Amino acid sequence: MAGRGTGCSLQLPAGTQPPGGGHLYPGESEGPEEESEVFELRPRGREKVRRSTSRDRLDGIILLTKDIQEGDTLNAIALQYCCSVADIKRVNNLINDQDFFALRSIKIPVKKFSVLTETHVSPKGRTVLRPAHYSPEVQEASPDKFTANETAGNFLKEVDRDIEEIVKCNDTKRENLNEVVSALAAQQVCFETDGRSKKCKDPYYGADWGIGWWTAVVIMLIIGIVTPVFYLLYYEVLVKADVSHHSTMESAHSFVTAASHQKQIEHGRSPANSINVDSQGDIRPYNRKPQANVIHRHIT
C-alpha cells in the first residue's frame, strides 16, 4: 500500500519535500513577499493588426435583443438580420444549436449604422427590438437620439398643421371637372410667368451694355464687311473722277490749240508767232526770230 501511495502521489521538488507524515500546500509555503508581477506584452506585426481589427469590429457592432417565437431558428434569424450563425452563438454563449431552444430571447449582433438599428413604431403582435449596447457611452448617447427624434417629430407636426391651414384657406371645391381643370391651368400659367420673370435679365446690365446677341452680330457684320466695301467703292469713285478730270482738261487744251492754229492760218500769220499755252496754263510766247523773217518777206 505504501508503494502504491508513493507511486500515485505527485513528486515535489527536492527543496520542497514535506517532512514525514506532514502535508505541504503551495499556498501556505509562498509568502506575501513572493508576489509575481505580470506585464502585458505589446503586440507587434500581424498580431497587432488582428487585435486592432477585432477591436474596430467590436466598436462598430451593437446587439439587438429579440424575443424568440415559435418557428424561429438560428439560420432563419441569421438570414433575417444578415449575420452569421457563429456570431450569434458567440454572443449568446451557445455551444450547440439545441441550446437555442432553451432561450426566451436572443442577442443579435448587427452593425452600428444600419437600417436595423433605426427606431420604428412596431405594430401589435410583432417583435420589438431592444438594442443592447456594449459601452455606457452609447447608452448615454441614446437620450440625445430620443430628443433629436422628438424635435424632428414636432417639426413634422408643425409642417402638417401649416399644410392643413393652407388647404383650408384655399377653397378648391368645384362643381364639375371643367372648373377644376381651368383652375389648375390658371395656377400653372401663373407659375410659368413667375419663373420667366425671374429668369429675365436686366436690360441695363453693364457687362454687355444692354445689347442682345443679335445686335452684337449685326455690329460685327457692319464693321467687318460693310465698312470695307464702302471704302473700296469710295476709292474707286475718286480714281475715276481724277481720270475723267485729266482727260477733259487735255481735250480742252487740244481743242483750243487747234482753233488758234486755224485762225492764224486764215489771217496769214504763221503759228510761230502764236502764243504757247502749256498744260499748266502758263502763257509763253515763241521766239521772235521767225517773226523778223516774216516781216522781211512782207517788205520785199
Swiss-Prot record:
Domain LysM: 64-108
Stored Pfam families: LysM
Keyword entries, A-Z: Cell membrane, Glycoprotein, Golgi apparatus, Membrane, Transmembrane, Transmembrane helix
Residues bearing carbohydrate: 149, 170
Matching InterPro entries: LYSM1-4 (IPR045030), LysM_dom (IPR018392), LysM_dom_sf (IPR036779)
Keyword Metal-binding on entry: no
Record's bilayer topology term: Single-pass membrane protein
Residues annotated as transmembrane: 213-233
Side Extracellular, residues: 1-212
GO cellular component, one term: plasma membrane
Stretch list, region Disordered: 1-52
Cytoplasmic-facing ranges: 234-300
PROSITE patterns on file: LYSM
Protein role: Essential for Golgi structural integrity.
Protein's name according to its UniProt entry: LysM and putative peptidoglycan-binding domain-containing protein 3
